Design a protein with these regions (language model features):
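Sec-dependent bacterial lipoprotein signal peptides
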Residues: 1-14
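Secreted/periplasmic proteins
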Residues: 16-174
Length: 174
């Protein structure tokens, strides 16, 4: 009887891990090869005037929820949870039709126009980056933005998987 109990105990412990679980990323979703020599030197996205992508800004449904993206640039500010996406999507098409580059300063947002630009500030450490919105997501009820791997790296939350941020749309100067 003791052997059976010990076997079940060992089997249960085998499923345990000492590594923290991540809310927004898996342990192996980061770079598959070497990082760029200094990711901190990758420049933020530079806001510029671009025509909006009609197909990427049409209303859509994801996971049973309807989204209606903004049809023009307008003020936007929201606080919430940011996550990041990496190697699993690297090289795959984004909602804009561009290929996802985990080393570019880009992000996915459910309703900000594609393309548009936003300043994202990590509320836990004050770091801030500017990203270009070129994809849709995240489709998780508590998350407001999905950043590229390098944007999350620069904000200091890759290991955590997610963090609390403020997202503010950057409007063109008139």
């Amino acid at each position: 009887m003791k052997r059976i109990a010990l076997t079940f105990l060992l089997a249960a412990l085998a499923g345990c891990t000492l590594e923290p679980t991540h809310t927004g990323a898996t342990r192996d979703d980061g770079p598959g090869g070497p990082l760029p020599s200094d990711p901190d030197k990758i420049a933020d996205a530079r806001p510029r005037s671009e025509p909006l992508n009609p197909g990427a800004n049409a209303p859509y449904t994801a996971l049973g929820r309807k989204y209606v993206p903004y049809q023009s640039l307008r003020p936007y500010r929201q606080r919430g949870l940011a996550s990041w996406y990496g190697r699993k999507f690297h090289g795959k098409p984004t909602s804009s039709g561009e290929r996802y580059d985990m080393y570019a300063m880009t992000a996915a947002h459910t309703i900000l126009p594609i393309p548009s630009y936003a300043r994202v500030t990590n509320l836990s450490n004050g770091r801030s980056v500017v990203v270009r919105i070129n994809d849709r997501g995240p489709f998780h009820p508590e998350r407001i933005i999905d950043l590229s791997y390098v944007a999350a790296y620069k904000l200091g939350y890759v290991a955590a998987g997610s963090t609390h941020v403020e997202v503010e749309a950057i409007l063109p100067r008139t």
